[in-house]
Regions:
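N-terminal accessory/capping or targeting/presequence segment of soluble
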Residues: 1-92, 96, 100, 104-155
């Protein structure tokens, strides 16, 4: 991150297709934090790390993050900062926060840009540090695409 001029990296629980069940290759949040729940976002700075998840996973996350550098952030609990608020409090102004733009929708990127900008932070969308640091990262799935029959389509 330091070499790239990045002060923080946000790691969501998504893949390039915004699928509900994501292939192993894109489970970077699980790999970096150890948290295996299906919903959560990890944020890693040069000095600190935190994981946001919802109430379904508070107990699981607390157990799995125990003994790690990650602090559990309980989403939508009074007093818990948003990711942008937290980053605004731990990073110098004008710091660069990065994401892998391939695993975020355009509306997510726009929302992140707005919230980070309100804390005087910049967003970079072209970084995938896991390509370099996750040595045994699973490969891209090689299954063939196929057309679903109309009988499976909604109205």
């Amino acid at each position: 991150m330091k070499r790239e001029g990045v002060s923080a990296f946000i790691v969501p629980s998504t893949d390039p297709h915004a699928g509900e069940y994501i292939p192993e290759r894109w489970k970077a949040r699980r790999w970096i934090s150890g948290f295996t729940g299906s919903a959560g976002t990890a944020v890693v700075t040069l000095k600190e790390a935190a994981l946001w998840t919802d109430s379904r996973y508070f107990i699981q996350a607390a157990k799995q993050l125990e003994g790690t550098e990650f602090v559990l952030m309980k989403e939508k609990v009074e007093g818990t900062p948003t990711i942008a608020e937290w980053l605004g409090s731990v990073l110098p102004q004008e710091s660069v926060v990065a994401i892998d733009g391939w695993v975020n929708t355009a509306s997510e990127v726009e929302s992140m840009e707005i919230s980070l900008k309100s804390h005087n932070l910049q967003l970079r969308t072209d970084l995938d540090p896991f390509a370099e640091i996750w040595e045994d990262r699973p490969s891209v799935p090689k299954g063939k695409a196929f057309i679903q029959g109309l009988e499976y389509a909604g109205e």
